[in-house]
Amino acid sequence: MVGYATILFVLFSTVSFFLAPTTYSKPFCVWEMVTFGLAGVLFLQHKIRRNGIICFDTFFIPTFFLINYAHAVFIYPDDEFLPPFRFATNTKLIPYALSVAQMGIAFYMLGNILFERENTESFRRLKADIPEMAVNRCALVSLAASFGLFVFVFVLRLANGFEHLYPRLMTMFLSLIALSWFFQAQQLLPEDHNFKGMLLRNKLNIISTLLFCASHLYIGSRGVVIFLLFMLLLLINNYYFRVKFKVLLPTIVVGLILMGFLAITRVSAYNLARVDFMESLQYGLEVIQESPSILWLLLTDFVVNAKTLYDGVDYAHVNGYLMGTAYVQYLFVFLPMGGSYFTKLLTGLDMDEVRTGYILTRFSEATYGLGTNMVGDIYMNFSLIGVLVLMFLLGLLVARVEFPASKYALYAYMALFANCIYLVRADIFSWLTFFVFFLIFDWLMRIHIVTYAETVSD
């Protein structure tokens, strides 16, 4: 049934695309939302039945709704309480941009449904052969990296205020921590697949995770923490115990509220690096009480990227397409500084200059970075055809790795799962960095160092 419903959704979305009005129309936006809602519910029911509640689409589909539909249907035109919408936006393009996004998600669902594996087990633990030497080495290196970060932030106090600390290095750190959790999971005995087993088997990993997360939350950096926690959610659910919906839902609600507070305070004088927790909390409460819409303010990080969808479409119509220059960096992500070097070599531009977030910030004449939108980013590079093809391929990829047949497929799924709520407000290849680091560190942690004692015994 879900297959026929998805095909029907593709057809409805295609017709709606050609009928999209040339100015804002709330009835049209509501129609798009309703058709997506019906198709999305059927699709999610199918995916959860196959995979359980902890799967990529459980988070990806609702996030896609919030980012691309909420503003057009529920917020516009009273949107000035959201700072990015105070900058110029071509609101006439809202229906067209929304129809482009809907075409994209329809083709994502189609690719996902058509290429699902025949194995319909709702739960499967991949078992990989990981030497104990690699397990211990990865845990110790992860702990050393996290402890060094903790000292840098809390003891030396070299990070003050809202900062993104060396993003590439932090991505390496969190990839190491997640890989260490995966390695440890390969050593489990039958009696270890429970909460107690998780605690006993991951003492060093838990310390590493706490040090890493505390350091970043203290300076208001949430992204890398979210990436890591989603990876761990997947691993814990797969290897230790099934996470129940009654536990997941309140955790998500509390997490959204906390992240909303952090979003409000992190760029103010009341971030945690400058004031204590209670002062920061009081400031956040005051801002929320003064807001005309508490819900959307707490969800600011999700709903504001609708603007970059509209702006991305507008930019492409005004200035033409980027023809993939924004994606050159991902061809060389495995090389240190490779992305920036080859982007400059092949395009003549710095890496920041080809990033759609940077381009759209200048296009809107904004005074701070606006970020990007996955669909808008693809549209800026390859037009509607690119949106359809790449979203279809993304759906295909998720369908093939959600039941991983090898550790490499699991690494790809971990990288995607880390980005399950971020991907919609980023570019479609942003998960590749994690995947490449998993491959590199997997190899490094397995290198066998021949000691003098071993040489003598030989």
Task: Give residue spans per PLM region.
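Small-residue-enriched transmembrane helix-hairpin modules in multi-pass membrane proteins
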Residues: 258-390
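Hydrophobic alpha-helical segments
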Residues: 217, 358-458
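Hydrophobic, membrane-inserted alpha-helices
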Residues: 10-17, 37-40, 206-214, 230-234, ...
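N-terminal "leader" segments that precede or initiate the main folded domain
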Residues: 1-118, 122, 209, 228-259, ...
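Hydrophobic, aromatic-rich transmembrane alpha-helices
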Residues: 36-44, 177-192, 389-401
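Short aromatic-rich membrane-water interface segments that cap or initiate transmembrane helices
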Residues: 87-100, 162-174, 370, 376-380
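Membrane-interfacial loop-to-transmembrane alpha-helix junctions, especially the N-terminal start
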Residues: 1-7, 50-63, 134-139, 194-205, ...
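Membrane-embedded catalytic interface detector for glycan/lipid assembly enzymes
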Residues: 22-27, 80-89, 108-243, 247, ...
